[in-house]
Curated annotation (Swiss-Prot):
Name of the protein in its database record: Isoleucine--tRNA ligase
Signal peptide start-end: none
Reaction(s) the record says it catalyses: tRNA(Ile) + L-isoleucine + ATP = L-isoleucyl-tRNA(Ile) + AMP + diphosphate
Binding of ATP, residues: 597
Major localisation: cytoplasm
Chain location of the short sequence motif 'KMSKS' region per the record: 594-598
Complexes and interactors: Monomer.
Binding annotation for Zn(2+): 892, 895, 912, 915
Cofactor(s) recorded in Swiss-Prot or TrEMBL: Zn(2+)
CDD domains with a match to the protein in the record: Anticodon_Ia_Ile_BEm (cd07960), IleRS_core (cd00818)
Function comment: Catalyzes the attachment of isoleucine to tRNA(Ile). As IleRS can inadvertently accommodate and process structurally similar amino acids such as valine, to avoid such errors it has two additional distinct tRNA(Ile)-dependent editing activities. One activity is designated as 'pretransfer' editing and involves the hydrolysis of activated Val-AMP. The other activity is designated 'posttransfer' editing and involves deacylation of mischarged Val-tRNA(Ile).
Entry keyword set: Aminoacyl-tRNA synthetase, ATP-binding, Cytoplasm, Ligase, Metal-binding, Nucleotide-binding, Protein biosynthesis, Zinc
GO cellular component: cytosol
Organism lineage: Bacteria, Bacillati, Bacillota, Clostridia, Eubacteriales
Length: 922
């Protein structure tokens, strides 16, 4: 008789191989056909809301790994919250305006933006943005991200733009919006102002020069003849705009002798200057900074005075302690100049070229003027020293060219108007990680006014008019309401298509009586676009809520979207738009280096999805401690693939042993389960608690490690290893087998749900195979499992901790015996145990030790019994010896256990008594 046919061998149609690149698109198609998003939302209607508000990615190019990390984290959160019983809508969005899209249109379509109409250029930009929205949308969906993809929010939509105008109007009504002449970050290449969030820092080599400014009027403090104040600058091109030299009122300054001249520098810099200039610089006089206020110098090459003033921003970190001050080219210079009533001189135009005010340098680009100015200083004997330095310098975020500080008339949002309220709101928000609070707090506390105007065309226009008669700026509740109404119907293109008269209320007149108006030509900063999504999206869409429960983006958004959203929300409504803010780090390779094309260390998420599957990528996101920088490489992805295989194989093994199990009628009550089964449920309870805690605290790596370790250790290496015999060999409907199947079912059912937010495709694939699952049901509409209190038996845990420590020592002894060729398989062995007195008492209370150790027999000797020679002594259990011997009896043909009872049953002479009994009852 072939006894193999009498075994309960595992069987399932659930595939062993994931084959994810082929299978996932089929599942995705099914989701789309069934409208999984609507199905889930319907299932959670009326439940408490949880709103994660999507920070909009830029509609430009294919998605990269940073996008994948961001969107998958959001998807894990939303899917978990849904399964935790919340109504958790997710409305994805896109940021669609701004310079990067303009640049791509110019570059890829070969368009000269000055040669086509504004309306036509904007149409091209819109088409470009929409193209990449469609591309990115499909790419995000392929990652398994569930959302309202049919109705995303786009910053170019007319409803969005109208709501944005409304926020601007609220800020203007509170006098937070003003026009001012002050230095702003300016990109000469892109010909526009930039916000702080549009600046990136990179290393740059600059000229560093020390220049003599001759004293013209010493005011009785300095002598007028042959006395010079020495300044230091790394931007020689700003010297034509110099109007003052700033000292610190409390610093000590010294007059030193250099041949027949007298030079003024800060005493704190003297030693470093002696070394750098290789001069002795003997001290002639000392002054305190405030004594020198009002001394007048002559500009070294322009007929103009340069006055000595005082400022707190002067430091002794570099230079001379005498700071070259050009109010038109620096924020600190501007602020100190304002205090002294200095004019704002900016002899540089929008292309970074000197204007006529630049004198001899007119028409020259500022970077080209540097060496010319230095040469002129040499010829005038005004150059003390010239050097080159490498330093971190501000560059444009899009064209990557160095930027300049340039005073221009711009529109600003006055941060001072609502700074205090914003700082108070920061205290009310939960910041994860907690250091994010200090970061954004300091940024808001130190932030200057926000330059919100841009000299471009692809964006939302600043809704301000000018009276042609008196030049007054026109903005009121009435004009804002009219523009908002038109934009809601026609979008912001109306600003460029209609004359001013049609955009203003009918019959509108200026206070001066004027009836002719022109429109502002600047558009809003894109950070104002995305920063008003709290109104345009959260307030406007009925399925969402304001404030959002969570904003989640990269940590660079403390100065970007988190900042602009907080600023506009507090300015308009006096409250933060979010209850909590979660940030993730940046991507690095295994050596901690940032991803870059030059290093060739990037990982393409689309390629990973194509070759391995989206669930592998999602598992990597889950495994990462994403709050810090996240390491990624092909090797790490391979590790994730292996971890996935372990989890999948474990789930498949569970399924394959449940092919005849009906949870409605085959379950065994908890009280009737053997200890090993109750121990497995204890472990399931613990892993369930840990996983749910990980989701709640956004510590998803807890989820990954808990599930992976549970599959690899508690299940595969212990429980499943032990009960395999029972599952295969015991009678099909025996209580012992059904007890194990009850546990397998509970473990499978829980694990699939616990991992569903992460392994979204695999959970969906396996769910219909789970016994008792209604046809057509979705795992995504299920709720998370819970750890039943009865499972969490502390006494049982303590007992099994000891028993598993013994098992571990036995396993080591068996492995040694196998290596020594004493046995070829654990089932050929009998284990003789020589415990200490305490352990003996413990082990005598454990039935079926052979089942737990997976050997044919166990002989437990008394503690007082003499231990034989050659005994293996346990490493971690004092006084515990183990001997491995060949098991007595014959090998059972059916279960492979050696038993002295093999042959007793004449009908089945090759079987042990247990197997003979089972077979006889078939």
């Amino acid at each position: 008789m072939d006894y193999r046919n009498t075994l309960n061998l595992p069987e399932t149609d659930f595939p062993m191989r994931g084959n994810l690149p082929q299978r996932e698109p089929e599942i995705l198609q099914k989701w789309e056909e069934e409208d999984i998003y609507a199905t889930v939302q319907k299932a959670r209607a009326g439940r408490p809301k949880f709103v994660l508000h999507d920070g909009p990615p830029y509609a430009n190019g294919d998605i990269h790994l940073g996008h994948a990390l961001n969107k998958v984290i959001k998807d894990i959160i939303v899917k978990y919250k849904t399964m935790a019983g919340f109504d958790a809508p997710y409305v994805p969005g896109w940021d669609t305006h701004g310079l990067p899209i303009e640049q791509q249109v110019i570059k890829k379509l070969g368009v000269n933006r000055h040669a086509v109409s504004v309306v036509e250029f904007r149409r091209m930009c819109k088409e470009y943005a929409k193209k990449y929205i469609s591309i990115q949308k499909e790419q995000f969906k392929r990652l398994g991200v569930r959302g309202d993809w049919k109705n995303p929010y786009l910053t170019l939509e007319k409803e969005y733009e109208a709501a944005q105008i409304g926020v601007f109007g609220k800020m203007a009504r509170k006098k937070y919006i003003y026009k001012g002449l002050k230095p702003v970050y300016w990109c000469p290449s892109c010909e526009t102002a930039l916000a702080e969030a549009e600046i990136e820092y990179a290393e740059k080599t600059s000229h560093a020069i020390y220049v003599k400014f001759p004293v013209k009027e010493g005011k009785g403090v300095l002598t007028d003849e042959n006395t010079f104040v020495i300044i230091w600058t790394t931007t020689p091109w700003t010297l034509p705009a110099n109007l003052a030299i700033t000292l610190h009122e409390e610093f000590s300054y010294v007059q030193v002798q250099v041949e027949k001249e007298h030079w003024l520098v800060a005493e704190g810099m003297l030693e470093s200057l002696r070394s750098l200039w290789n001069l002795e610089l003997p001290v002639e006089k000392r002054f305190v900074g405030k004594e020198l206020e009002g001394v007048i110098c002559k500009h070294p090459f322009i007929e103009r005075d340069s006055v000595l003033i005082l400022g707190e921003h002067v430091t002794l970190e570099a230079g001379t302690g005498c700071v070259h001050t050009a109010p038109g080219h620096g924020e600190e210079d501007f602020n100190v100049g304002k205090k002294y009533g200095l004019p704002v001189l900016c002899p540089v135009d929008h292309q970074g070229k000197f204007t006529a005010e630049g004198g001899a340098y007119a028409g020259m680009k500022v970077d080209k003027a540097n060496p010319v100015i230095i040469e002129d200083l040499k010829n005038l004997h005004a150059l003390v020293h010239e050097d080159k330095i490498k330093h971190s310098y501000a560059h444009c975020w899009r064209c990557n060219n160095p930027i300049i500080y340039r005073a221009t008339e711009q529109w600003f949002a006055s941060i001072d108007g609502f700074r205090k309220a914003a700082l108070e709101e920061i205290d009310k928000v939960q910041w994860i990680p907690s250091w994010g609070k200090d970061r954004i707090y300091n940024m808001i506390a130190d932030r200057g006014d926000w330059c919100i105007s841009r000299q471009r065309t692809w964006g939302v226009p600043i809704p301000i008019f000018y009276c042609e008669d008196c030049g007054k700026e026109i903005i009121s509740d009435e004009t804002i309401a009219k523009v908002q109404e038109i934009f809601r119907e026609e979008g912001s293109d109306a600003w460029f298509l209609r004359p001013a008269a049609e955009l203003l209320p009918e019959g509108f007149t200026c206070a001066c009586g004027g009836k002719s108006f022109r429109k502002e030509t600047d558009i809003m900063d894109v950070w104002f676009d995305s920063g008003t999504s709290h109104t345009s999206v959260l307030m406007e869409r009925k399925e969402l809520a304001w404030p959002a429960d969570l904003y989640m983006e990269g940590s660079d958004q403390h100065r970007g979207w988190f900042n602009s959203s907080l600023s506009t929300s507090v300015a308009a409504y006096g409250k933060a738009p979010y209850k909590a803010v979660l940030t993730h780090g940046f991507l690095v390779d295994e050596k901690g280096r940032k991803m870059s094309k030059s290093l060739g260390n990037g990982v393409d998420p689309l390629q990973v999805t194509k070759e391995m599957g989206a669930d592998i990528l999602r598992l990597w996101v889950c495994a990462a401690d994403y709050k810090n920088d996240v390491a990624v490489s092909p090797r790490i992805m391979k590790q994730m693939s292996e971890a996935y295989r372990k989890i999948r194989n474990t789930l498949r093994f569970l399924l394959s042993n449940l092919n005849d199990f009906d949870p409605a009628k085959d379950r065994v009550a908890y009280k009737d389960l053997p200890e090993i089964d109750r121990w497995a449920l204890l472990q399931l309870g613990k892993v369930t608690q840990r996983v749910l805690q990980g989701y709640e605290k956004y510590e998803f790596h807890w989820v990954y490690h808990s599930v992976h370790n549970f599959c690899a250790v508690e299940l595969s290496a212990i429980y499943l290893d032990i009960v395999k015999d029972r599952l295969y060999v015991e009678g099909k409907n025996s209580t012992l087998r059904r007890a194990s199947q009850t546990v397998l079912y509970d473990v499978l059912n829980a694990l699939v749900r616990l991992m569903a937010p992460v392994l979204t495709y695999t959970a969906d694939e396996i769910w219909p195979y789970v016994p008792g699952v209604p046809a057509g049901s979705h795992v995504q509409t299920e709720e998370m499992p819970e750890a039943l209190p009865q499972w969490l038996d502390e006494a049982l845990e303590k007992k099994w901790d000891t028993l598993l420590a013994v098992r571990s020592e036995v396993t080591k002894a068996l492995e040694k015996a196998r290596q020594d060729k004493l046995i070829n398989h654990p089932l050929t062995a009998q284990v003789d145990l020589y415990p200490n007195a305490e352990l003996e008492g413990f082990l005598r209370g454990i039935p079926n030790l052979s089942e737990i150790f997976i050997v044919s027999a166990v002989q437990l000797h008394s503690a007082g019994e003499e231990k034989p020679e050659g005994l293996s002594m346990a490493e971690d259990l004092a006084g515990f010896g183990i001997a491995v011997n060949s098991a007595a009896g014959e090998k059972c043909e059916r279960c492979w256990i050696y038993d002295t009872g093999v042959g007793e049953n004449q009908e089945h002479p090759t079987l042990c008594p247990r197997c003979a009994s089972v077979v006889s009852h078939l």
